[in-house]
């Protein structure tokens, strides 16, 4: 029973954790916190597949163009 617990609680998470050696998780999370709230909102909505309403002069593929 102890071996099974060790495999599932220690080895399995280590095997599925894939870190890029040049960019640790702490640095990535810190960089995301430095974004302003509007940028974070845009990233989150883009990741969720939702589109943000933007002014017509700044239309991109990440947002919908609003009239007025």
UniProtKB/Swiss-Prot annotation:
Keywords: Amidation, Disulfide bond, Neurotoxin, Secreted, Signal, Toxin. Residues 18-51 form a propeptide. Expressed by the venom duct. Residues 1-17 form the signal peptide. The modification Leucine amide is found at residue 67. Disulfide bonds join 53-65, 54-63, 59-66. Transmembrane segments: none annotated. GO terms for molecular function: ion channel inhibitor activity; toxin activity. Its main location: secreted. The keyword DNA damage does not apply. Coiled coil: none annotated. GO terms for cellular component: extracellular region. It is found in: Secreted. The cysteine framework is III (CC-C-C-CC). Classified in the M-1 branch, since 1 residue stands between the fourth and the fifth cysteine residues. Belongs to the conotoxin M superfamily. This is Conotoxin PnMLKM-011. It comes from Conus pennaceus (Feathered cone).
């Amino acid at each position: 029973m102890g071996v099974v617990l060790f495999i599932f609680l220690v080895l399995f998470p280590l095997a599925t954790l894939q870190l890029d050696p040049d960019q640790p998780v702490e640095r990535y999370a810190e960089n995301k916190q430095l974004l302003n709230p509007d940028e974070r909102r845009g990233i989150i909505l883009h990741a969720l597949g939702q589109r943000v309403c933007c002014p017509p002069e700044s239309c991109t593929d990440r947002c919908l163009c609003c009239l007025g």
